[in-house]
């Protein structure tokens, strides 16, 4: 996958292919995104949405469309992971524009470097993913630290996969690498993915 749940992997879309995504959020929010494979190594996408599209509150839109770019630098081999660089400016939740924060509740990844490695198991493919990111657009809160993220996915069969990821959120909540712990903050997500195959 090009992403786990929110965490980017080193994979990119194939040339000429596209991906349409919709994310439902807490509070009736919704984000729509479209990505296209420009080459076998480079993908480009845009996303836009609202933190309260569903419901009876006064409709608010995010201040701008957000970008999603990724370029695979190094192909994965038997001994080394695939490596990609990218830019993702789409955060999640409310966009706090009226105060001094000027940021999403959950910051976007911003610039990132991601690495992915796959192995064949008796069940199917097992992949581990990790990376580092720096958000340069949501820094009015005074927290400009780089961030770390990790994840894994494992196939149960050709259609179903289990996904787990952890966004350390080192650029939020005064988290640092010295205090890094799941019990102290960050975002831990898990999901079951159903891929329709012919």
Which residues make up each language-model segment?
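Glycine- and Gly-Pro-enriched alpha-helical subdomains that act as flexible
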Residues: 143-144
């Amino acid at each position: 996958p090009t992403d786990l749940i929110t965490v980017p992997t080193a994979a990119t879309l194939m040339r000429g292919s596209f991906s349409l995504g919709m994310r439902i959020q807490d509070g009736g929010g919704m984000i729509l995104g479209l990505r296209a494979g420009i080459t076998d190594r480079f993908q480009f996408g845009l996303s836009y949405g609202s933190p309260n599209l569903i419901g009876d509150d006064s409709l608010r839109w995010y201040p701008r469309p957000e970008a999603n770019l990724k370029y695979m630098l190094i192909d994965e081999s038997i001994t080394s992971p695939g490596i990609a660089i990218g830019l993702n400016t789409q955060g999640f939740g409310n966009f706090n524009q009226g105060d001094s924060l000027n940021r999403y509740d959950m910051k976007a990844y911003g610039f990132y470097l991601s690495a992915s490695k796959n192995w064949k198991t008796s069940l199917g493919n097992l992949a581990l993913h990790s990376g580092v990111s720096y958000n340069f657009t949501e820094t009015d809160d005074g927290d400009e630290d780089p961030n770390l993220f990790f994840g894994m996915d494992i196939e149960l069969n050709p259609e179903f996969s289990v996904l787990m990821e952890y966004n350390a959120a080192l650029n939020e909540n005064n988290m640092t690498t010295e205090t890094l712990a799941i019990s102290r903050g960050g975002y831990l997500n898990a999901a079951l993915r159903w891929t329709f195959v012919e």
